[in-house]
Amino acid sequence: MEKVLSVQNLHVSFTTYGGTVQAVRGVSFDLYKGETFAIVGESGCGKSVTSQSIMGLLPPYSAKVTDGRILFKNKDLCRLSDKEMRGIRGADISMIFQDPMTALNPTLTVGDQLGEALLRHKKMSKKAARKEVLSMLSLVGIPDPGERLKQYPHQFSGGMRQRIVIAMALICEPDILIADEPTTALDVTIQAQILELFKEIQRKTDVSVILITHDLGVVAQVADRVAVMYAGKMAEIGTRKDIFYQPQHPYTKGLLGSVPRLDLNGAELTPIDGTPPDLFSPPPGCPFAARCPNRMVVCDRVYPGQTIRSDSHTVNCWLQDQRAEHAVLSGDAKD
């Protein structure tokens, strides 16, 4: 498979009045052409910060990439100037944000907002840009695009606004599309339509998608590969089948176990006890150790290396170490 993006040992920190928050700590993954790569995890785990780092949209005065590389077309995005990133952002790498209403300019028509990207990045004439806008609105399922492009965002429903935001992200035919919680603000019926739209667009354009979400139901429908993120680190990466049917990390198992089951009457929810670690002063060992039911002494002291279970499945957990069974049996486990 053709690799289109490589994130290597990414570290991002935020400077606050209370100290330095280590939001992302050593994140690494590759993205391949035409795939949907989902990053899942609870709020504050660093998944959105990772996507903002790729887009070059981190707050300039408080956030900083302190280490690592983001390689795209033989360029390290972390080393590019603002001017160079503006040439890539929107043209080669686009992003869909959570709330379509705040992502659109209420004072400009939909046609003007979609056409602006073509005029800037593709240097098209207004006539050619209008033709492209009509085609894109049709692709994302906007009825009567010739009339709708003259309208303003407030004249569209929430689902239609999200379709317009998707059209805006795809208008310049990017190589990578980052979707940050694209269905959070939508009801279940509209959510299903948008997810089906994602599948259709990917079939037609072969765009690579990074999906940022906490909704495992969404992941199960559209993702090819899944990364489970916790406290700024990758806990487990695998195919959708690996993660849903053969989870190895205790946090991944906890996430799946906490999802309500509609097929089991009266089934109790299984919460994950405890709280995430303080990222002002993260622990030296596994960040999930304090909440882990299989905790060992080594988990508190040293961060586990990556265990490769297959070509598609990697886990960062001491339980994958060959010595783990002996450690538990010898009484190294903590209560």
Swiss-Prot record:
GO molecular function, one term: ATP binding
GO CC annotation, single: plasma membrane
NCBIfam families from the UniProt entry: oligo_HPY
Coiled coil: none
The protein's role, per its UniProt record: Probably part of the ABC transporter DppBCDE involved in dipeptide transport. Responsible for energy coupling to the transport system.
SMART domains the record matches: AAA (SM00382)
EC number annotated for this UniProt entry: 7.4.2.9
Highest taxon above the source species: Bacteria
Broadest EC class assigned to this enzyme: translocase
PANTHER family for this protein: DIPEPTIDE TRANSPORT ATP-BINDING PROTEIN DPPD, OLIGOPEPTIDE TRANSPORT ATP-BINDING PROTEIN APPD
Protein name as catalogued: Dipeptide transport ATP-binding protein DppD
Ligand binding (ATP): 41-48
Reactions listed under catalytic activity: a dipeptide(out) + ATP + H2O = a dipeptide(in) + ADP + phosphate + H(+)
Gene name as annotated: dppD
Family the UniProt entry places it in: Belongs to the ABC transporter superfamily.
Organism this protein belongs to: Bacillus subtilis (strain 168)
Cellular compartments annotated: Cell membrane
Main subcellular location: membrane
Keyword vocabulary terms for this entry: ATP-binding, Cell membrane, Membrane, Nucleotide-binding, Peptide transport, Protein transport, Sporulation, Translocase, Transport
GO biological-process terms attached to the record: peptide transport; protein transport; sporulation resulting in formation of a cellular spore; transmembrane transport
